[in-house]
Regions:
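N-terminal cationic and glycine-rich segments that engage phosphates or anionic surfaces
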Residues: 181, 206-230, 236, 240-243
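Short, charge-rich amphipathic alpha-helical segments embedded
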Residues: 118, 122-149, 183-201, 249-262
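Hydrophobic side-chain positions on well-ordered alpha-helices
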Residues: 112, 166-167, 234, 238-241
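Amphipathic alpha-helical repeat scaffolds of TPR domains
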Residues: 97-114, 126-129, 133, 150-169, ...
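Solenoid-repeat scaffolds in large eukaryotic assemblies
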Residues: 121, 128, 173-179, 229-231, ...
């Protein structure tokens, strides 16, 4: 992959609070070794230094290695409860536990981005989207629903960029273009739908920042990797122009491209 693309990924997916050191091998169990940066404060609350805590995350399953209720993750546990028809409304402590799990997967997916393991990063982003959906459907408190939903633009940015870069590695430029175009559009629409919620928190910048990040990746890939225009974008432009002949031509072209035909 182009070095400029790697540099942008490093910029977007490095959290200075969690510094990846490399891999550790524990009797054949490879883990991600990192340092957590913890600020040291004086009695008056002034920063006086930093403490580096050595941590390790498992590469598979829940990053901290815990198995809540004997399942691979809380998401797996609640999905099992749903399957059995036994999931009650999620109390505030349940929602807090789900948010804590989402934080573990957020940290690890950043590491996967830094390592160039884009499909693993995508899977961890999808895990957190699953947690978000769970809270949206079953949290008893509306505040708990929004506490995760507000981060949807961030998680979708990560999922889409990871999926796009994984497709790029397979030289599937159309999928790369489609992932980025759809994400940029859907994040912008989400921000419009929830404009009042973000305004109450003075957090409108979250949405615009995530949109700009996806756009930056797409622009760089167009410059460095000859990324084509997304089929959906071409079709929407034809629809806006009310050009029936062009719409039909593009529809047939999209079908050929997405089916892999010449």
């Amino acid at each position: 992959m182009n070095e400029k693309v790697r540099q942008l990924v490093e910029e977007l997916f490095t959290d200075p609070r969690y510094l990846l050191r490399g891999e550790a091998d524990r009797f054949g169990d490879k883990r991600l070794a990192f340092s957590e940066v913890c600020p040291l404060l004086s009695a008056t609350g002034e920063p006086i230094g930093q403490l580096l805590l050595s941590r390790e995350y498992r590469r598979r399953g829940r990053p901290d290695g815990e198995r809540p209720h004997g399942q691979e993750s809380l998401l797996d546990f609640y999905h099992d409860q749903l399957f059995q028809g036994r999931l009650p409304a999620l109390a505030r402590e349940d929602a807090a536990a789900l948010r804590e799990e989402s934080w573990l997967y957020y940290i690890r997916r950043n590491f996967f981005f830094q390592l160039g393991e884009y499909d693993n990063a995508r899977q961890d982003a999808e895990h957190n989207l699953g947690l978000l959906d769970l809270l949206q459907g079953y949290a008893a408190d509306e505040a708990d629903k929004w506490s995760m939903a507000r981060w949807w633009p961030w998680i979708e940015r990560d999922r889409a960029i990871a999926a796009a870069l994984a497709a790029l590695e397979q030289e599937d430029l159309l999928t790369t273009a489609s992932e980025l175009y759809r994400a940029e559009k859907s994040i912008r629409e989400f921000g419009e739908q929830h404009a009042e919620d973000y305004a109450r928190e003075d957090a409108e910048k979250l949405v615009t920042t995530m949109v700009s990040h996806v756009a930056r990746v797409a622009e760089l890939l167009r410059e460095e990797e000859n990324l084509p225009e997304a089929p959906e974008e071409r079709l929407e432009r034809a629809v806006d122009a009310v050009d029936a002949e062009e719409i039909e031509r593009l529809r047939r072209e999209m079908e050929r491209e997405l089916s892999g035909e010449g």
